[in-house]
Amino acid sequence: MLIDGHGRKVDYLRISLTERCNFRCQYCMPEKPFSWVPKENLLNFEDLFKFVKAAIDEGITKIRLTGGEPTLRADLDKFIKMIYDYKPDIDLAMTTNGYLLKDIAQDLKKAGLKRLNISLDSLKPEVAAKIASKDVLKNVLEGIDAALEAGLKVKINMVPLKGVNEDEIVDVMEYCKDRGMQIRFIEYMENVHAHSDLVGMHGKEILDKIKQKYEIEKIGRQGSSPAFLYKLKEDGYIFGLIDPHKHDFCETCNRIRLTAEGYLIPCLYFDEAMSIKEAVQAGDIDRAVEILKTVLANKPKENRWSEDANEASNRAFYETGG
């Protein structure tokens, strides 16, 4: 069992397979030009899998593949199958923008992927294009349909932004409700790489938009999930709100992050990290596990997105998967 320095059980590993992305979302990507990490600097799937096996043996029960955009990584389905074959009952999920899903959803399901979180910030082509800096909506909607047809469990993530997509909060929720998908509204997380003119909506503002049409009931958090759940009184539809600015957001954090270059990151907000790359490539898995435990021992108690401070993180979310 893996325990962090504050006594929290850690059983959830998030793996960023690449920092590259085929979108340039305003709340994630920098305005100024930047260079990707060379592909040869990334851990290959064989070395990644060595660490994944060790992490599972130490108590990891849930793995989420992220990016950047994970579907850009070649042989993604083969890596998923490697994990599934080693531990068929592992909770294996992926976060994606959905743009490439139409042609690969069936393969991912067959390989052993169980769940998907797909970003959908607007149902208006022009607004989706503004946010992603690319005409994306048609492909994303087709990807969602393909994932559902493949039998994957799908949740939708939406980041409400003032003056951009705040008028679509209910529309996107109803789109999800009609298709049996849970939507999770994610508060915009301030970071130095996002466009400087963005203003996110706080949880209360998001709920107020929904209350203009629906009566809602609080459910609460389930397990270690960061989402606070609510229910529509009308039909029992459940949606989530991820609010990192709340003081209790970090109390049940059970996750550790691994970047595509092999850095273990204890918290999305903080820059501190340790690399397992050399240890894994040398076949010294015991050393990699030691590094994992050291990082967990230094895991902070909470982030700094407090309701009062609203500090901006230096961490690039396209490196760590958000």
From Swiss-Prot:
The protein's Enzyme Commission number: 4.1.99.22
Residues that bind [4Fe-4S] cluster 1: C21, C25, C28
Keyword Membrane on entry: no
UniProt binding sites for [4Fe-4S] cluster 2: C250, C253, C267
Co-factor note (free text): Binds 2 [4Fe-4S] clusters. Binds 1 [4Fe-4S] cluster coordinated with 3 cysteines and an exchangeable S-adenosyl-L-methionine and 1 [4Fe-4S] cluster coordinated with 3 cysteines and the GTP-derived substrate.
Transmembrane region(s): none
A UniProt-annotated Pfam family: Mob_synth_C
Top-level division of the source organism's lineage: Bacteria
Name of the protein in question: GTP 3',8-cyclase
Species whose genome carries this gene: Nitratiruptor sp. (strain SB155-2)
